[in-house]
């Protein structure tokens, strides 16, 4: 795993952080959906880097020493409460903004990380994103006040787009009769809360193999709610659900909660949920 991160560093991260002549502010986010959001607000006034790059599982992410040295250079860090952030907190001295601070959090009963008290997938909700975009904007204005007009204009545009997105998602799922969703990994609690779904999770909280009791629990859920599809996540829980998919002849649907373009990803999630 460590060799993989060093390889990624040598192939791509060096180029990103090696731009010594740039006068743009260097901004750090924890996962790529927030890279997308910060770039939408900041435009080309900032360089935005993500701790966890695309195609990696944030729940099992490890930081290489060289990568840690590189992220010391940033001037602002937008955090979301993920477990791997604790490693960075000890060595990053820049201003840190907790984007989960003002969110109505869902307790972590069905999510993934035992050491966290809440579900960290807060970006999978247009309502949450409106709060977080405002927090991002205020922090950017404080960091680069010369661009305040641009930041506030882009923030207002994003807020309007989120209102439209919320309406579109509501329309997509409005006629859906199946409101129970079986997922390999509990990533969709906020989306479910916003749009009237109930999330049932296959995976155990500690990522361990399913016990016989777990299998019975999932089988009962499938029967009780007449479920015919299961949501597989790009980075989590696919192995534990494979046997159940075969046994019950279920339709697998692959989603990626960590896709960079969070707006289009929310539409993809809505479409998937509407066709269960």
From Swiss-Prot:
Keyword Signal: yes
InterPro entries in the record: Bact_metal-bind_prot9, Lipoprotein_PsaA-like, ZnuA-like
Keyword Chloroplast included in the entry's annotation: no
GO cellular component: periplasmic space
Molecular function terms from GO: metal ion binding
Residues the entry annotates as binding a divalent metal cation: 59, 121, 185, 256
Keywords in alphabetical order: Metal-binding, Periplasm, Signal, Transport
Database matches in Pfam families: ZnuA (PF01297)
Entry's localization field: Periplasm
Superkingdom as given in the UniProt entry: Bacteria
One Gene Ontology term from the biological process aspect of the record: cell adhesion
Signal peptide: 1-18
Family: Belongs to the bacterial solute-binding protein 9 family.
Function according to Swiss-Prot or TrEMBL: Part of an ATP-binding cassette (ABC) transport system involved in metal import. Binds a metal with high affinity and specificity and delivers it to the membrane permease for translocation into the cytoplasm.
PANTHER family membership: HIGH-AFFINITY ZINC UPTAKE SYSTEM PROTEIN ZNUA, HIGH-AFFINITY ZINC UPTAKE SYSTEM PROTEIN ZNUA-RELATED
Protein name, entry field: Putative metal-binding protein CT_415
Organism of origin: Chlamydia trachomatis serovar D (strain ATCC VR-885 / DSM 19411 / UW-3/Cx)
Organism taxonomic ancestry: Bacteria, Pseudomonadati, Chlamydiota, Chlamydiia, Chlamydiales
